[in-house]
Amino acid sequence: MPNAPCLMPSLTITRPAILQLDHVTKQFPASSTAAVEDVSLTLAQGDLLALLGPSGCGKTTLLRMIAGFEPLQSGTIALAGRTVASSGVWVPPEQRSVGMVFQDFALFPHLTVEQNVAFGLQKVADSAQIKARTAEAIAQVRLQGLENRYPSELSGGQQQRVALARALAPRPALILLDEPLSNLDVQVRLRLREEIREVLKSAGISGVFVTHDQEEALAISDQVAVMQQGRLEQLGTPEEVYHHPASRFVAEFVTQANFIAARRQGQLWQTEVGNFKLPPDEWIESESGDLMVRQEDLLLEADPEATVVIRDRHFLGREYCYCLSTLSGQELHARTTTAINLP
């Protein structure tokens, strides 16, 4: 698959937009390149957006600009139809109706669960409203009975639920989550990412979720924005991004796909590991290029005359990952069920 220009599928927004970014750019004074460059996207009310990319790609900087923690260089940020940042407009963070969940929980150690959740309500509600909203938020994240505990008496997963409840309590229009699961162990992460999606969906609150974990982004979001070096490489549904990557970077980063040199012969693409037939809607004019083959699409069979050698095999529980070497020395990876057990 040759490098392709960034493809932005036209997403039909039937619900009002809760977040709109138009040509947003940010460059720090000490840097020669932009941290965020010309990013435009729209998030519909009630949807969850994952900002996905490697470290340093600009996703956290973009999140901080949406929150109001970083000024932008150029472009426009609008929340619920209201411009909150542009060349002539600056709305401070506390007036943006945005909740924030941080990677390190950011709880007050001297306050109880109830007091932490209620903290952001002190200036916007009376005592009766504070009590009602605090109880509602604690119930939303299923922490009833732990109201009087301190953060030091909670597990990591429980602390992150408190942080989420605190963000939910003021009933913001949008919640921003900056890699909220990265400090948790695997089982807690899997459970909590399901709960975060369920809580936000049931509350009808939109969310922007920053992560460098591909599986996490695909599982939790309605839209995925893949970023590289400050630019938006692709915006689409998880299925679109996975099955129709817009560039080689997206294919490599999101699916860990193999790329195999290929030459066209009629309707077939010939490679050193076999021939591939592409469906008509994926035909291209070029006579040669790199063919993208996902790890799960490589089918393995034992063949004593084959030129592909199994170099190693990793057991991953539900599947095997085979490390392969071709005659030319290229390294490939294939994933199979454990029912396929090659030597």
Label the model's feature ranges.
Residues 52-54:
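The feature captures the beta-strand-to-loop junction immediately N-terminal to the Walker
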Residues 60-63, 162:
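ABC ATPase nucleotide-binding domain helices that frame the ATP-binding cleft
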Residues 67:
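Helix-to-loop junction immediately C-terminal to a conserved catalytic motif
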Residues 75-86:
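Conserved ABC transporter NBD signature motif
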Residues 93, 97-99, 103, 107-249:
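ABC ATPase nucleotide-binding domains
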Residues 257, 267-343:
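Non-catalytic connector elements of ABC transporters
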